[in-house]
C-alpha cells in the first residue's frame, strides 16, 4: 500500500544513504591513546606525582605562504631528524622514557608500528639505567598494557633475524602488565610503574 501526503504526493520514506567509509587516515592512528596519556600526564603534573611530557617532533619549516598575516600556511616542511620515543620525564628520581602505540588487531601487535631508531633509543635508555617501556593498546578490545622495553627489543631483534613481524597478544598478556582504564587519571600507568620497577 502506497502512503501519500495530504497534498497527494507519494511518501517515499527515509532511505538511508549507503554508509560511506571514510578514507584511511594514518596520521592520527594513536590519537585516542595519545589524548588519554596527555590528560593522564597533566593529572600527574598537577598533583606533583610525576613530570612526564610528550616530546615535540622536530620539524624544519622550508616554505610558508602568507596570503595575509593571519592566514599563514606552511606549504613545505620536513622532519629534522628521526624522532625517538613519544614521552619522557622523571618519576621518583628515575628517568622514564616510553613509546605509545595502538592497533585494531585483536590477536597480535604489529612491529611495523615501531621504527628501528626508536628501538635503538630504547636500548640506550635501558643501558643507562632508565625506565623504558611501551604502552600498547588493543583499541577494539579496549585493553591497554605496559610492556617493558626488554621484551619489545627481544621481539624486534627476532623480527630482524627473519622471525615473526608481530608480538602475539598472549605474549603481551604474559610479559606485559594490564593498565586499567579509569576516570582520573584515565590511564594510571604510574601505579603499574610502581609495581614493576619500584617493588623489586
From Swiss-Prot:
InterPro entries: Resolv_RecU, Restrct_endonuc-II-like, tRNA_endonuc-like_dom_sf. Endonuclease that resolves Holliday junction intermediates in genetic recombination. Cleaves mobile four-strand junctions by introducing symmetrical nicks in paired strands. Promotes annealing of linear ssDNA with homologous dsDNA. Required for DNA repair, homologous recombination and chromosome segregation. Homodimer. It comes from Geobacillus kaustophilus (strain HTA426). GO terms for cellular component: cytoplasm. This is Holliday junction resolvase RecU. Binds 1 Mg(2+) ion per subunit. Residues 1-27 are annotated as: Disordered.
Amino acid at each position: 500500500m502506497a502512503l501519500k501526503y495530504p497534498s497527494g504526493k507519494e511518501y517515499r520514506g527515509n532511505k538511508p544513504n549507503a554508509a560511506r567509509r571514510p578514507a584511511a587516515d594514518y596520521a592520527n592512528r594513536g590519537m585516542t591513546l595519545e589524548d588519554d596519556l596527555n590528560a593522564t600526564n597533566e593529572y600527574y603534573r598537577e598533583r606533583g606525582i610525576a613530570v612526564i611530557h610528550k616530546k615535540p617532533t622536530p620539524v624544519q619549516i622550508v616554505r610558508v605562504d602568507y596570503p595575509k598575516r593571519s592566514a599563514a600556511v606552511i606549504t613545505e616542511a620536513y622532519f629534522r631528524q628521526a624522532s625517538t620515543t613519544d614521552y619522557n620525564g622523571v618519576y621518583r628520581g628515575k628517568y622514564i622514557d616510553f613509546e605509545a602505540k595502538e592497533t585494531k588487531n585483536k590477536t597480535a601487535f604489529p612491529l611495523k608500528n615501531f621504527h628501528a631508531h626508536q628501538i635503538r633509543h630504547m636500548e640506550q635508555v635501558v643501558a643507562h639505567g632508565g625506565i623504558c617501556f611501551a604502552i600498547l593498546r588493543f583499541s577494539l578490545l579496549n585493553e591497554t598494557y605496559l610492556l617493558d622495553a626488554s621484551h619489545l627489543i627481544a621481539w624486534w631483534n627476532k623480527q630482524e633475524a627473519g622471525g615473526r613481524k608481530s608480538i602475539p597478544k598472549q605474549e603481551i598478556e604474559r610479559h606485559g602488565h594490564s593498565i586499567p582504564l579509569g576516570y582520573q587519571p584515565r590511564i594510571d600507568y604510574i601505579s603499574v610503574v610502581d609495581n614493576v620497577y619500584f617493588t623489586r
